[in-house]
């Protein structure tokens, strides 16, 4: 961030007058800085007295005085005193689940000394205005809210949101660029590790939002949306100095800048020591995207660093909070299906389990029905998870499951592949030694290709193949199309509400064991097929009728794309 050149003159004088920490240059010889020798770390001064506590409460928004974001031209920042101080302490104590005594006891000071993010927790209330004297009304003031700190540059130098209801701001575009500043790298991790960790942090947000994050090393700095860098004390032209190791470890600014305190001992996510750079980066990116702090247990947006969480993820509330700003992920699927497997429990009994999969382009997601979300870390490349089948644009999946048969097939173009569930790979040949893939016309006579989609109906022991506006019912026992087929999809699967129907070119159709129902997908919408239970409750419903369409994102959550550069993370 190159905002120093446009600081207000008074602020610049305050900055230059402040003591500048002198640090020896961190020595390295390798291009990637893997042999870098970090300079000694500075320690933050503990909060141990009344004055330090007052500064803390003001700095992080707990008092009614805004003094958090850089020196003030009018002199040193005010601090809460007397009754105002006691009330600020009580607010802080309540948020930290401490007895709200209003006294600076040992437990309260300990909470203030915990490592934390530098973004304020609360937006202070506006100062009380004195009564207006009689006379003409005052001239209109600036439209900037009196609650907001002074804007020191085009980037606004203010945090993104507050738990007291202040309006959070969000990016207006969906593709965001980021860059780790080459002049502000960590002295403790290799460049490769830093870039990998930061890219993973962006990916974690991309997995739950329609945002696409891409690393940009070529554009001019001013064109990059989110810039990240490490620094100590006064750093990167920033008006807010870092305090050394032990307290404030990072801060984020509106519209995209994130700074990490290089005096902190940042470590990779696999380490059980230090502060996880991944966890801090995910937190700060949350601020840049518009999320404030919360004291809710389990949230990545808690202001304090929570150790011993090596496998942390964005919880349900964090996901819903960010989706409130950017919306849910929408999109079509090439195919969707439930994968059935047999397992033995602790008593040796055979149990049938299932997992739901969604395929799109060259990626796939496993959907955890019990948690109502995609698996952490998805999507994954089809090439990685399904050896031997086409690596993109799967047309259909069919699982023929009877007392005598347990066969799984993938379809693409004019061919199909059989998949071996036990070996977890596509078969290369059948029992007679004939090679896979095979032509659809040979294995399923009478079925056209390429297909739109297909599914196996266990009730009737039929495969329904869909092609444009037609559906073909295929008898798996006789290996032929039923005599009365093909028929129009609207004839076999009529609309419950007239004209509320996909009509043709269905993207995917599958039977869900989680809902005991058949679903048709087209675009970002789905139609549920009337099942036996529906008919029992409402006998007037047509057999195999389609209920009115709904959005896929309202039933299956967080099936989100990520940038292709992060697919293998």
Swiss-Prot record:
Its cofactor is Zn(2+); Ca(2+). Gene3D superfamilies: Collagenase (Catalytic Domain), Hemopexin-like domain. A motif (Cysteine switch) lies at residues 115-122. Its EC number is 3.4.24.-. GO terms for molecular function: metalloendopeptidase activity; zinc ion binding. Zn(2+) binds at residues 117, 283, 287, 293. This is Matrix metalloproteinase-21. The lineage of its organism: Eukaryota, Metazoa, Chordata, Craniata, Vertebrata. The gene is MMP21. SUPFAM superfamilies: Hemopexin-like domain, Metalloproteases ('zincins'), catalytic domain, PGBD-like.
């Amino acid at each position: 961030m190159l905002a120093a050149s446009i600081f207000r003159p008074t602020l610049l004088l305050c900055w230059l007058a402040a003591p500048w920490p002198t640090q020896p240059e961190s020595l390295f010889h390798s291009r990637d800085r893997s042999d870098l020798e970090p300079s000694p770390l500075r320690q933050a001064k503990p909060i141990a007295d009344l004055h330090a506590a007052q500064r803390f409460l003001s700095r992080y928004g707990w008092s009614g005085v805004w003094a958090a974001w850089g020196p003030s031209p009018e002199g040193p920042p005010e601090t809460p005193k007397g009754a105002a101080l006691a009330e600020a302490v009580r607010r802080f104590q309540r948020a930290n689940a401490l007895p709200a005594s209003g006294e600076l006891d040992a437990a309260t000071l300990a909470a203030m000394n915990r490592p934390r993010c530098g973004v304020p927790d609360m937006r202070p209330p506006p100062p009380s205005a004195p009564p207006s004297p009689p006379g003409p009304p005052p001239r209109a003031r600036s439209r900037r809210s009196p609650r907001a700190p002074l804007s020191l540059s085009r980037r606004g130098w203010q945090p993104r949101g507050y738990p007291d209801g202040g309006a959070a701001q969000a990016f207006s575009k969906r593709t965001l660029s980021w860059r780790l500043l080459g002049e502000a790298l960590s002295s403790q991790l290799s460049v490769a590790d830093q870039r990998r960790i930061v890219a993973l942090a962006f990916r974690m947000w991309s997995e739950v939002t329609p945002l696409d994050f891409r690393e940009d090393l070529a554009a001019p700095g001013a064109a990059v949306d989110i810039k990240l860098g490490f620094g100590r004390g006064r750093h990167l032209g920033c008006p807010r100095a870092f305090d050394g190791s032990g307290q404030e470890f990072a801060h984020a600014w509106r519209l995209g800048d994130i700074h990490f305190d290089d005096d902190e001992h940042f470590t990779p996510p696999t380490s059980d020591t230090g502060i996880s750079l991944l966890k801090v980066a995910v937190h700060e990116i949350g601020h840049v995207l518009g999320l404030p702090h919360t004291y809710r247990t389990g949230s990545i947006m808690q202001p304090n660093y929570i150790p011993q969480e090596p496998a942390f993820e964005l919880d349900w509330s964090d996901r819903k909070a960010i989706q409130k700003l950017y919306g849910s992920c929408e999109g079509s699927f090439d195919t969707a299906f439930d994968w059935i497997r047999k397992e033995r429990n602790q008593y040796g009994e055979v149990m049938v389990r299932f997992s739901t999969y969604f395929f799109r382009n060259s990626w796939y997601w496993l959907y955890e029905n019990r948690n109502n979300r995609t698996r952490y870390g998805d999507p994954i490349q089809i090439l990685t998870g399904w050896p031997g089948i086409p690596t993109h644009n799967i047309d259909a999946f069919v699982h023929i499951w009877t007392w005598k048969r347990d066969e799984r097939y993938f379809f693409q173009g004019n061919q199909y592949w059989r998949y071996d569930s036990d070996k977890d790979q596509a078969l290369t040949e059948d029992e007679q030694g004939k090679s896979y893939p095979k032509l659809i016309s040979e294995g399923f006579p009478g079925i056209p290709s390429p297909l739109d989609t297909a599914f196996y109906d266990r009730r009737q022991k039929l495969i329904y193949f869909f092609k444009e506006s037609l559906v073909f019912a295929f008898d798996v026992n006789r290996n032929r199309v039923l005599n009365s087929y093909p028929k129009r999809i609207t004839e076999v699967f009529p609309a419950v509400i007239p004209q509320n129907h996909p009509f043709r070119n269905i993207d995917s159709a599958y039977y869900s064991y989680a809902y005991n129902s058949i679903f048709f997908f087209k675009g970002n919408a789905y139609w549920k097929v009337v099942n036996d239970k529906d008919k029992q409750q409402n006998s007037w419903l047509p057999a195999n009728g389609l209920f009115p369409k709904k959005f896929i994102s309202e039933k299956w959550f967080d099936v989100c794309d990520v940038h292709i550069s992060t697919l293998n993370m």
